[in-house]
Regions:
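Charged docking surfaces used in two-component/phosphorelay signaling
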Residues: 17-25
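Alpha4 helix (beta4-alpha4-beta5 surface) of REC/receiver domains from two-component response regulators
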Residues: 20, 64, 86-103, 110-113
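The feature encodes the CheY-like receiver
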Residues: 16, 58, 76, 104
């Protein structure tokens, strides 16, 4: 099975690079963007399986990015996880179709579980078959 690709959009370089290291260590391919323009470009060019998006990014902010991505036929099915230090945006995020809203500072294990769950749900919605391991008893 091919590695899943995740687009991380955050203008804080240390956050983005730290997340990239953690995601790569967990077996994901990772691409980075630091503003709204790069986020749109990379989402359309790279076709990620999931987007991790900060709210406070240059060029319009994460909510504008999410809204435009969800309106585009090419990107509307990509799950979006907001990862942000901005409290109070959960309702707006979910109205825009977010899969999750995670506050910074985040617990790495919880974020990884959230990513895994969003990818599993997305895979099921896209029509991919999800196979369960079965054990035969003899």
């Amino acid at each position: 099975m091919a590695k899943k690709k995740i687009l991380v959009v955050d203008d804080e370089e240390d956050v983005a690079k730290g997340l990239k290291v953690r995601l790569k260590a967990s077996g994901y391919n990772v691409v980075l963007a630091s503003d709204s323009v790069q986020a749109f470009m990379m989402a359309n060019k790279e076709k990620p399986d999931l987007i991790i998006l900060d709210i406070m990014i240059p060029g319009g902010g994460g909510f504008v990015v999410a809204e435009r991505l969800k309106q585009s036929a090419a990107t509307h099915r990509i799950p979006i996880i907001f990862l942000t230090g901005v409290p109070g945006g959960e309702e707006r995020a979910y109205k825009l179709g977010a899969s999750a809203y995670v506050m910074k500072p985040y617990q790495p294990e919880e974020l990884m579980e959230t990513i895994h769950n969003a990818l599993e749900i997305s895979r099921g919605e896209s029509g991919e078959t999800v196979t369960a391991a079965t054990s035969a008893t003899s």
